[in-house]
Design a protein with these regions (language model features):
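Glycine-rich beta-strand-centered segment in the early N-terminal region that forms part
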Residues: 19-34, 44-86, 126-128
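NAD(P)H dinucleotide-binding glycine-rich loop of Rossmann-like/cofactor-binding domains
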Residues: 83-161
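Short, well-ordered coil/turn residues at beta-beta hairpins
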Residues: 33, 216-218
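A short acidic, Gly/Pro-enriched loop at the edge of an enzyme's catalytic core
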Residues: 207-215
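N-terminal Rossmann-like NAD(P) cofactor-binding module of classical short-chain dehydrogenase/reductase
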Residues: 75, 216, 239
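Glycine-rich phosphate-binding loop and adjacent beta-alpha segment
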Residues: 222-281, 316-318
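Mid-domain Rossmann-like dinucleotide-binding core that forms the NAD(H)/NADP(H) cofactor-binding site
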Residues: 129-204
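C-terminal hydrophobic helical "lid"/dimerization subdomain
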Residues: 226, 271-318
Length: 318
C-alpha cells in the first residue's frame, strides 16, 4: 500500500508498505480522509524520534473486525493502551506506560491506505456528519480535554492565545461555557472567522496583563507562552495545548510567586466531540483549506506549512 513514511526527519511517499495484519482485538480500517495537524509538522522537525507512517486524524471504513463495524465509518482514539499498567488501572489509558500512539509512538499512522487500531478505540461516525467534518473529531476532542481538566463557567475570564486550527476549535468549545472569552492571534483574517461567530478577538499585543483567570497557549512557541503567562492573575491557570519542538525558557520564580497552576493538555473525549459535530455546535467546514490525494502527500505537507493555512486534508479513497 501507499503511505507517507517518516525516517530521520525526512518524509517520503512509499508505495510498497505491507497492508497491516490486525492482531486479535484490533480492526483493519481503510482510510478515507486524514488531516495534517501541528503535531505532524513538529514530528518532521524532530520533536520526537519517530520512524514510520505518520498521521493520526482520520476517518475510515472498517474492513476487518467485528461484524457490527464492517463497512461502517469510524474515527479512532490514538492511544492504544495495555489495559494492565498502573495508569490503565486508574482509568488513565492515555498515559499507559506501554502505550503506542497512532502515527507518533511505535504505531504506524493514518497517512496511508490502511491502518490497524484496537477495536475499543473506534467510534462510529453519525450519519449526518460528513467524512470531511469527521476528520476533526480528534482535535475537537483535544479541545474538550480542557474542560475535563478544569471547570470553566460564565464568571471566568479566559484567554486563548493562537488563531490556528486548534485555537479555532478551542475557542468554539470554550464559547459554549458562556465564559468571558478573548482569542488573540497574529492573523486578522483568521480572527475574523471567530468574530463572525460572536467570539471576541484581538491582536496578540493587545492583551491586558494579569487580567485573566485562565489562559490557553495553542501556539507551540515561546512568544505565545509568554503572552499567555503575562495575562494571568495571581493563582491563575495556564494550559498548554501544543507541543514544542525545542526547549522553552520560562521565569520559574514568577510562577512560584504568583502561584500559577500549569496544566499540560493532550487527548480528549471522542463521544462529546462527535456530538458537537452531529449537532453542529462546532463549525469545521471553514477551517478546510484544501484537499490532496495521498499521491501528492508531500505537496500537501508543503501546503500545510504555509503561513496562514489552516487544515489540509489527504484523500486516500472515495
Amino acid at each position: 500500500m501507499k503511505g507517507l513514511w517518516l525516517e530521520n526527519n525526512q518524509l517520503e511517499l512509499r508505495t510498497n508498505i505491507p497492508i497491516p495484519e490486525p492482531p486479535p482485538g484490533e480492526a483493519l480500517v481503510r482510510i478515507l480522509r486524514a488531516g495534517i495537524c501541528h503535531t505532524d509538522l513538529e514530528l518532521i522537525k524532530g520533536y520526537y524520534p519517530y520512524t514510520g507512517i505518520i498521521g493520526h486524524e482520520f476517518v475510515g471504513i472498517v474492513e476487518q473486525g467485528p461484524q457490527q463495524l464492517i463497512n461502517q465509518r469510524v474515527v479512532g482514539e490514538i492511544n492504544a493502551a495495555c489495559g494492565t499498567c498502573r495508569f490503565c488501572r486508574r482509568g488513565q489509558p492515555t498515559h499507559c506506560e506501554n502505550r503506542t500512539v497512532l502515527g507518533i509512538v511505535n504505531r504506524n499512522g493514518a497517512f496511508a491506505e490502511y491502518l490497524s487500531l484496537p477495536i475499543e478505540n473506534l467510534h462510529l461516525v453519525p450519519e449526518n456528519v460528513s467524512t470531511a467534518a469527521a476528520t476533526f473529531t480528534e482535535p475537537i476532542a483535544a479541545a474538550l480535554e480542557i474542560q475535563q481538566q478544569i471547570q470553566i463557567g460564565k464568571d471566568d475570564r479566559v484567554l486563548v492565545v493562537g488563531d490556528g486550527k486548534l485555537g479555532q476549535l478551542i475557542a468554539q468549545t470554550l464559547a459554549l461555557t458562556s465564559c468571558e472569552l478573548l482569542v488573540v492571534g497574529r492573523h486578522k483574517e483568521k480572527l475574523t472567522n471567530l468574530s463572525a461567530k460572536g467570539i471576541k478577538t484581538g491582536l496578540a499585543d493587545s492583551v491586558t496583563d494579569r487580567y485573566f483567570d485562565i489562559s490557553v497557549d495553542c501556539t507551540g512557541n515561546p512568544e505565545g507562552f509568554n503572552i499567555a503567562r503575562r495575562a494571568l492573575r495571581p493563582r491563575g491557570t495556564l494550559i498548554l495545548k501544543s507541543t514544542y519542538a525545542g526547549n522553552l525558557s520560562l521565569d520559574a520564580s514568577s510562577l512560584v510567586v504568583d502561584e500559577i497552576t500549569l496544566i499540560g493538555s493532550r487527548c480528549g473525549p471522542f463521544v462529546p466531540a462527535l456530538e458537537l459535530l452531529a449537532t453542529e455546535k462546532v463549525d469545521v467546514q471553514y477551517l478546510i483549506d484544501s484537499y490532496y490525494p495521498l499521491s501528492q502527500g508531500l505537496e500537501a505537507f508543503e501546503k500545510a506549512k504555509t503561513k496562514g493555512v489552516l487544515k489540509v486534508l489527504l484523500e486516500m479513497s472515495s
